[in-house]
Amino acid sequence: MSKRRVAADLPSGTNSSMPVQRHRVSSLRGTHSPSSLDSPPASRTSAVGSLVRAPGVYVGVAPSGGIGGLGARVTRRALGISSVFLQGLRSSGLANVPAPGPERDHTTVEDLGGCLVEYMTKVHALEQVSQELETQLRAHLESKAKSSGGWDALRASWASSYQQVGEAVLENARLLLQMETIQAGADDFKERYENEQPFRKAAEEEVSSLYKVIDEANLTKTDLEHQIESLKEELGFLSRSYEEDVKVLYKQLAGSELEQADVPMGTGLDDVLETIRVQWERDVEKNRAEAGALLQAKQQTEVVHVSQTQEEKLAAALSVELHDTSRQVQSLQAETESLRALKRGLENSLHDAQHWHDMELQNLGAVVGRLEAELAEIRSETEQQQQERAHLLACKSQLQKDVASYHALLDREENN
């Protein structure tokens, strides 16, 4: 008895020799790639690799020849679906669903929802028809089980191969979606980093301008300190000269009196007259000297008074100037303290900004490094999955050749 295999359309490499297409979708999880289908409820494992069972891939057998000539034509009649409906199924299948991307809009989502609703309706109809066909196929297989003892092992091998192919397709779609998500995250971090660059440059320029202001304030402070030192030296010189002038004036006013010894008087008239004349001349000279001294002292007193008045005026002016200078010094000291406080605040702000920028750069570098490592890992996994997929496709083509040869042998046996 000849047996033919009825399998669902695979996501890639569909063979036209498989007459019946059968899909089963239980749920839609998140975003699917155009070639991915949801897996059935029961979890199944494969003997080859560690892949998950391919969703929507089922293997059945349909008799060819024999009763009613079951085959492609009989299957189509059993399905009760016109060629137009099947063509619509092929044109509106998952292969035509556009691949989602990070920039899909609301219209694309609505179109995808409509396509998925239409597809689900057709899938439910196909499931009902497939259940009827499966019942017929199982009844026919049970009647032919004795003559086809080796068919179970072959069917298990085919199921395993199709399962591995479907699992590889699903894993590839999942990895592609994960790569797109990671790439979108990396682009977002890169955009944030580029947006932060102008703020960082503006902060650096502001800090540079503040450094210039601080340097100018330091220069002004140094100049004012030099001026204060020169004013202090001039004030000390004026104080010393004033003290010296006062001491000289005191020395001039404090004159010393000369002590003169008495001359003994003679006993004669001439001696008496001579003594009187000498005393009179001495008194005259003394009075003249006293008058000259008094006049000179008066003149010196007037000069000293005038000089004292000028010195007092100069001292008052110097005291006023000293008061103004001290007030300027105090204001400059207060301004210097405020500039120092401003400098400390700016230095703290600069330190905080630099620390924050360093932390941001470190975080971004760590994120970029992690994303690059994940991207490299995903690329390696993708390459491995592609290699496994190519290997499975080769196995599939080999199995299809074996199935074709088995079909030929079964046809010859049936004809014989």
From Swiss-Prot:
<feature type="modified residue" description="Phosphoserine">
    <location>
        <position position="91"/>
    </location>
</feature>
<feature type="coiled-coil region">
    <location>
        <begin position="170"/>
        <end position="249"/>
    </location>
</feature>
<dbReference type="GO" id="GO:0005938">
    <property type="term" value="C:cell cortex"/>
</dbReference>
<dbReference type="InterPro" id="IPR039008">
    <property type="entry name" value="IF_rod_dom"/>
</dbReference>
<feature type="domain" description="IF rod">
    <location>
        <begin position="105"/>
        <end position="416"/>
    </location>
</feature>
<feature type="modified residue" description="N-acetylserine">
    <location>
        <position position="2"/>
    </location>
</feature>
<dbReference type="GO" id="GO:0045109">
    <property type="term" value="P:intermediate filament organization"/>
</dbReference>
<feature type="region of interest" description="Tail">
    <location>
        <begin position="397"/>
        <end position="416"/>
    </location>
</feature>
<feature type="compositionally biased region" description="Polar residues">
    <location>
        <begin position="28"/>
        <end position="48"/>
    </location>
</feature>
<dbReference type="GO" id="GO:0005212">
    <property type="term" value="F:structural constituent of eye lens"/>
</dbReference>
<feature type="modified residue" description="Phosphoserine">
    <location>
        <position position="33"/>
    </location>
</feature>
<comment type="subunit">
    <text>Part of a complex required for lens intermediate filament formation composed of BFSP1, BFSP2 and CRYAA. Found in a complex composed of PPL (via C-terminal linker domain), BFSP1 and BFSP2 in the retinal lens. Within the complex interacts with PPL (via C-terminal linker domain) and with BFSP1. Identified in a complex that contains VIM, EZR, AHNAK, BFSP1, BFSP2, ANK2, PLEC, PRX and spectrin. Interacts with LGSN. Interacts with VIM.</text>
</comment>
<dbReference type="GO" id="GO:0005737">
    <property type="term" value="C:cytoplasm"/>
</dbReference>
<feature type="modified residue" description="Phosphoserine">
    <location>
        <position position="36"/>
    </location>
</feature>
<dbReference type="GO" id="GO:0005886">
    <property type="term" value="C:plasma membrane"/>
</dbReference>
<keyword id="KW-0963">Cytoplasm</keyword>
<dbReference type="GO" id="GO:0048469">
    <property type="term" value="P:cell maturation"/>
</dbReference>
<feature type="coiled-coil region">
    <location>
        <begin position="308"/>
        <end position="402"/>
    </location>
</feature>
<dbReference type="GO" id="GO:0005882">
    <property type="term" value="C:intermediate filament"/>
</dbReference>
<dbReference type="InterPro" id="IPR002957">
    <property type="entry name" value="Keratin_I"/>
</dbReference>
<keyword id="KW-0716">Sensory transduction</keyword>
<feature type="region of interest" description="Disordered">
    <location>
        <begin position="1"/>
        <end position="48"/>
    </location>
</feature>
<comment type="similarity">
    <text>Belongs to the intermediate filament family.</text>
</comment>
<feature type="region of interest" description="Head">
    <location>
        <begin position="2"/>
        <end position="115"/>
    </location>
</feature>
<keyword id="KW-0007">Acetylation</keyword>
<keyword id="KW-0206">Cytoskeleton</keyword>
<dbReference type="GO" id="GO:0045104">
    <property type="term" value="P:intermediate filament cytoskeleton organization"/>
</dbReference>
<keyword id="KW-0597">Phosphoprotein</keyword>
<dbReference type="Pfam" id="PF00038">
    <property type="entry name" value="Filament"/>
</dbReference>
<keyword id="KW-0472">Membrane</keyword>
<dbReference type="GO" id="GO:0007010">
    <property type="term" value="P:cytoskeleton organization"/>
</dbReference>
<dbReference type="GO" id="GO:0070307">
    <property type="term" value="P:lens fiber cell development"/>
</dbReference>
<keyword id="KW-0844">Vision</keyword>
<keyword id="KW-0403">Intermediate filament</keyword>
<dbReference type="GO" id="GO:0007601">
    <property type="term" value="P:visual perception"/>
</dbReference>
<feature type="modified residue" description="Phosphoserine">
    <location>
        <position position="27"/>
    </location>
</feature>
<feature type="coiled-coil region">
    <location>
        <begin position="116"/>
        <end position="146"/>
    </location>
</feature>
<keyword id="KW-0273">Eye lens protein</keyword>
<keyword id="KW-0677">Repeat</keyword>
<keyword id="KW-1003">Cell membrane</keyword>
<comment type="function">
    <text>Required for the correct formation of lens intermediate filaments as part of a complex composed of BFSP1, BFSP2 and CRYAA. Plays a role in maintenance of retinal lens optical clarity.</text>
</comment>
<keyword id="KW-0175">Coiled coil</keyword>
